[in-house]
UniProtKB/Swiss-Prot annotation:
GO terms for cellular component: core mediator complex; mediator complex. The keyword Transcription regulation applies. The lineage of its organism: Eukaryota, Fungi, Dikarya, Ascomycota, Saccharomycotina. Residues 42-85, 137-158 are annotated as: Disordered. PANTHER family: MEDIATOR OF RNA POLYMERASE II TRANSCRIPTION SUBUNIT 7. It comes from Candida albicans (strain SC5314 / ATCC MYA-2876). GO terms for molecular function: transcription coactivator activity. This is Mediator of RNA polymerase II transcription subunit 7.
């Protein structure tokens, strides 16, 4: 019984590795495709005739009837591809995705914005007063900074690097102060810790949101580094290929020079005797050259 249970469990695991195909794949047959083509031809003729009648009667066509006429009946409707989703977002794989790839602001995420998005208000007095508010009272820092440009949806895109650094420093100071206040509350009245935990959570979310604004810059820099590494690797491969080519050329030259010297030493002593005794002509010299080439190739292959 135990072996049967293990085999059934293994079969379930194997069958659950990949999801089964959708059931409407069975409708994609040649007969249904032919029926769909005939239906589309008939539907085009009927729609043209109905539009002509509506123009003659000066009546507006009903949108519901037109949508119903554009959908084939029965199982043929599964052969028509679905329409593109309308609106700013769509659902896929259990999540909601935006068509426009941008970082949502904190207001859209139902969180309070603590940092200031206006770049014109960053003077020495404003930063000093903000820092004093952080040190004296953290609650006024959270509520006070939240009121400034909290509803600006495009402020995050217009933030400069200097502004982000200043706001991150202020948020870090506020985070440290809230942590110290939380320790003091826990030592005096631990029941009142909830409000400080909420403030720390809110500050951390704002810090995380500001850091996420650096994601496009990080992706560009990482892409540049990847391309530079690929270019360096290609140059290294080219250098190695050139070195191998030069090495092979030098080996070929050395083999040719060695063979020529050996042949020249042997032929100079025996040229007169071979021509007198055998009477060989130009054909024999051609055979010697071919043999020389073959010997050089063989030695080259053996050396490689």
């Amino acid at each position: 019984m135990s072996t049967n249970n293990t085999t059934t469990n293994n079969e379930d695991l194997i069958s659950s590795l990949y999801p089964p195909p959708p059931p409407y794949y069975k409708f994609f047959t040649k007969d249904n495709l032919q029926k769909l083509s005939t239906w589309q031809e008939n539907n085009q003729t009927t729609t043209v005739s109905s539009e002509v009648k509506l123009e003659e009667e000066n009546t507006d066509p009903d949108s519901n009837n037109s949508e119903e006429n554009s959908i084939p009946p029965g199982e043929l409707r599964f052969l028509i591809p679905p329409k593109q989703p309308e609106g700013p977002q769509y659902r896929g794989y259990g999540n909601i995705w935006l068509f426009e790839d941008k970082l949502p602001n904190l207001k859209d995420s139902q969180w309070e914005q603590l940092y200031n998005t206006s770049t014109s208000t960053f003077t020495s007095t404003s930063t000093s007063t903000a820092n004093t508010n952080i040190i004296t009272n953290t609650d006024t820092d959270i509520n006070g900074n939240q009121e400034v440009d909290a509803g600006d949806s495009t402020g995050d895109e217009n933030l400069t690097s200097e502004t982000k650094i200043k706001e991150l420093h202020k948020l870090m100071d506020s985070l440290l102060l809230n942590f110290l206040e939380l320790i003091g509350i826990l030592s005096i009245d631990p029941i009142k810790y909830d409000k400080k935990i909420h403030d720390i959570n809110l500050i951390l979310i704002n810090i995380n949101h500001l850091l996420n604004t650096y994601r496009p810059h990080q992706s560009r820099e990482s892409l540049i580094m990847l391309l530079k590494n690929q270019i360096d690797y290609k140059f290294l491969e080219i250098d190695q290929i050139n070195k191998k080519c030069l090495d092979i050329k030098s080996k070929i030259k050395n083999l040719i020079n060695e063979r020529i010297t050996v042949v020249s030493d042997g032929t100079t002593t025996n040229t007169t005797t071979t021509t007198k005794t055998t009477g060989l002509g130009d054909g024999d010299s051609i055979d010697e050259k071919e043999q020389l080439k073959q010997d050089i190739i063989n030695r080259l292959l053996s050396s490689i």
